[in-house]
Amino acid sequence: MASSSSNRQFSHRNVNTFLTYPHCPENPEIVCQMIWELVGRWTPKYIICAQEAHKDGDMHLHALLQTEKPVRITDSRFFDIEGFHPNIQSAKSVNKVRDYILKEPLAVFERGTFIPRKSSFQGNPSKGNSEKKPSKDEIMREIISHSTSKLEYLSMIRKEFPYDWATKLQYFEYSANKLFPEIQEEFISPHPPSSPDLLCNESIKDWLQPNIFQVSPESYMLLQPTCYTLEDAISDLEWMDKLSSQQMKEQESRASTSSVQQELGNLLGPEA
């Protein structure tokens, strides 16, 4: 139960994903190809995977994944490869993450073209006005691509567009809720299953017949002041049951006989 609860609370959304597979001796090329296929819907652009060894000889893998669209998952087991479960993080500084992966690799595999992160949304002020400033749309695109949570998204907007943040906060909050929706927890009924199961139709019928549709001897005694014992009540109820059954059979017999006579009359036609 604890594992399912933690899995429901997990959420990852980013175009840059940093994965670490501990105790994993798998080939980096095989792992890269499998991850590439897993994220096909988000249009992968680049992946690098490096194998490293601890001092005790234990192998582990590091991988950096870059996609055109943000990878959006709520299943913490999504990136599991051959039973190996990774630590999943958002790579806020892809340049540093890539350098870290390449520090002491035993084996490396790359696919695609690495996309370095821009040093600043507003450009480099030391270069004066010679470098064109990014447009508002470009800055927002960077914020949407690199923010990893609702709080970080709003904080980045506040930093880059303080006036817009102060005057149009409700619109930014709306977009934040769309980008990072709340994870709905699975409903767990506070009431344990009943025994017998009340959803079982057969059990309900078995209970209805003697308790609702039939008169109990005790109820009959309450309704009949002249009935003093339980045996008398049972005897009266049995007699009434037999009598009503007999009367129903007689009615059915008369109805069937009348139906046959009507059919014969229709066949013979009216008398002359």
Swiss-Prot record:
Cellular component aspect of the GO annotation: host cell cytoplasm; host cell nucleus
Name by which UniProt lists this protein: Replication-associated protein A
EC number: 3.1.21.-
Quaternary state and interactors: Homooligomer. Interacts (via LXCXE domain) with host retinoblastoma-related protein 1 (RBR1), and may thereby deregulate the host cell cycle. Part of the C- and V-complexes which are RepA-Rep-DNA complexes involved in the c-sense and v-sense transcription.
Motif stretch (RCR-3): 100-103
Domains (record comment): There are 3 rolling circle replication (RCR) motifs. RCR-2 may be involved in metal coordination. RCR-3 is required for phosphodiester bond cleavage for initiation of RCR.
Single GO MF annotation: nucleotidyltransferase activity
InterPro entries: CRESS_DNA_REP, Gemini_AL1_MSV, Gemini_AL1_REP, Gemini_AL1_REP_central
Free-text cofactor note: Divalent metal cations, possibly Mg(2+) or Mn(2+).
Comp. bias (Polar residues): 119-128, 245-264
Chief location of this protein within or outside the cell: host cell
Annotated compartments: Host nucleus; Host cytoplasm
Organism: Maize streak virus genotype B (isolate Tas)
